[in-house]
């Protein structure tokens, strides 16, 4: 049944999806230069209300836009105050060259290290494999620095993370990024949720604030896992 499904998907992509994208590219190319709105959503009727709805959907809260802006401003100010206090007590920190352990310069080694390191804070990860793939150069300009491809609900034994080499990021950046996308971030959260009896209907729904909130939170913990 799975093989039939895979074959059908390939057929649909070849006969419908790719031709549809080709037609869309052609149509959008013809429209280049005819746009009359340089102000985004706010310049459309009910644009403000639509934006507010998007904010609520993507954050998962009922805070107003102004309240969210204030929360962000308060958090940033708190971070600045903390950094100022730390630098005042140790000015040399500003010029320190922070580097990862030489054994953690390989992406697969980073994933293996993170998978073990998180056990002091979180339940043991599922028995899964992680494949790290590099974004094709033709797409590097348009894609995020990294992203996790959500595993199928019926088979989360193999997972894939894409890394974009468009920018010359440091090893520490890649380490924290792999924590965000891998362990204990998106990959870990997805597989553990599945193993605990994730309700299938949730695979049809989107919780961007909850999912990205978790990954961003644990990304900050990665500095500790890196031994810094």
Give residue spans per PLM region.
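N-terminal maturation segment of proteins
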Residues: 1-228
